[in-house]
Amino acid sequence: MQTYTGIIKTPLDAIILFEACRIGLLPRVQRRLSDHERSLIRAGSVFVWDEREAGMRRWTDGKSWSASRVSGSFLTYREMEGKRKPYHHGLSTDGSLKRSPSADTTGNSSLNAYSNEDSGAASLSDEESVDDENLRGLHYKPNGLIKQSFSITTSLNHKLHLISYSSPIPDPSLVTPSSDVNLSRITIPYGLYPDAGPPLVQAPKFLAPYDILVEKVACSEDARVLDKLRQALWL
């Protein structure tokens, strides 16, 4: 069920995996994970799913997570020890009205929630905010996982989600999709991922460094230009 093993650092990394799944190079998640599959989640585990294809909007991994934090285009969570208390709408024990999910600047419901069974991807709007009472007794898990979520809607109205797991201690054996030689030939179709914005996809074809033929370099000046171009493409 796992889509990829590696590290996701940028939206481009996520989009490369979306495209690899679209063309059949990598598998998409088709259903919720079983208990056994949840137990196999490790640093480097990456999961991609199509909301309509898998029939699910929210990710289920059975772990407890901290409040979400916005990190660029991603939402980031830290693994917690223990389980949060169930959240209920309506009146609290003293008869006062319980706090309902608050709207964030994007118009989605607040994603700052401790997520036990369901932790959503960045585009989801049905996460529940949690009262301070529910946060008591929860602590960051020593050497616990870090989870990132990323979502995008394609021009064909496919809602795609990505969940990745990493460790606070970097693993040098894990690479990003954008630096993975096995994915270096993937091209991003122009206009398919409009939410990615102009900085990510500006031309009909994503130019990988391997598309540049070294044997066509005519002189040392050309070589210097080529090196600069390659460095820019890897950023």
From Swiss-Prot:
Name a biological process GO annotation. Answer: signal transduction
Disordered: where is this region?
85-128
Q: Does the keyword Phosphoprotein apply?
A: no
* A GO term from the CC aspect: cytosol
Keywords noted in UniProt: Cell cycle, Meiosis
Q: Which InterPro entries match?
A: Gti1/Pac2 (IPR018608)
Q: Where is the composition biased (Polar residues)?
A: 102-118
Keyword Ribonucleoprotein among UniProt keywords = no
A Pfam entry, by short name? Gti1_Pac2
**Family (UniProt):** To yeast YEL007w and to the N-terminal of S.pombe gti1.
Role this protein plays = Controls the onset of sexual development, by inhibiting the expression of ste11, in a pathway that is independent of the cAMP cascade.
- Write down what this protein is called: cAMP-independent regulatory protein pac2
Top-level taxonomy: Eukaryota, Fungi, Dikarya, Ascomycota, Taphrinomycotina
Which gene is this protein's source? pac2
